[in-house]
């Protein structure tokens, strides 16, 4: 274990694993991580990455005097459908929605591989102050690569993409998976990029900061989704493999912690510094991070409050093979979790007469 006073690490160190005694084998595929001598799961690529992030965070707080950036907890709306609603559907013989939701999580996790392709301009070209010995300085020296491998796997080693598929197949006894699930996700992701908020910084710089802020928001919002999945898949009344399926989700949740922390750290380091426009003028890093993160949060809340409930009900209506789907939906709705967004996001609340239940 490296001394926490260290601030500079090689790519190989950031990607290094802690020793394990037993591999994690999922559906015949060796996945990342493993089990130590006491049988405890150990997340991959954490031998140096975790203490490095801790050291960078401590340095940031000591030198800037400011707290780490975070996504406000009050913006994370309850999961929809909630645990009770999903269990009701499964006990009613309506399995296809859960098959689809778990498949969507797996597919989106696999998209995490794309983070390694994110262009990072030379830091000195847009940050006035020194960035040596920071998380920022290690984005292309292991942090993005570790994140990509965690989510999508690496060479023959499975990652979260494969682990979510396995959890779904174990809990729901190898359901048929429609290829339409993937194509629908691709279609939704095909929307163009938002208009720039800070064109004076140049597109590559804004894209980098926007991407990190959006991924952090996704990771924070997803934490409640993963807890939701673990609670459902661990219930023997609705899960065909409650121990195996829930354990896989538990391992994934442990793996996600370094993603949240390194992104918080890098964004905090930007906040504490002065950014430079294309013509060399200073811009507050705090304002850039806050404004880009705020837009991302608003987009996610709009989707969860307005778009997701409609998609959920449409999916149930299309796939529920029951005599009276309207009666099913009435019972489903009665189990929902009402939620009112914080006052600063009141304009995003569903319109009068729309579903009051929030979504993923």
What are these regions (language model features)?
Residues 1-360:
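Non-heme di-metal
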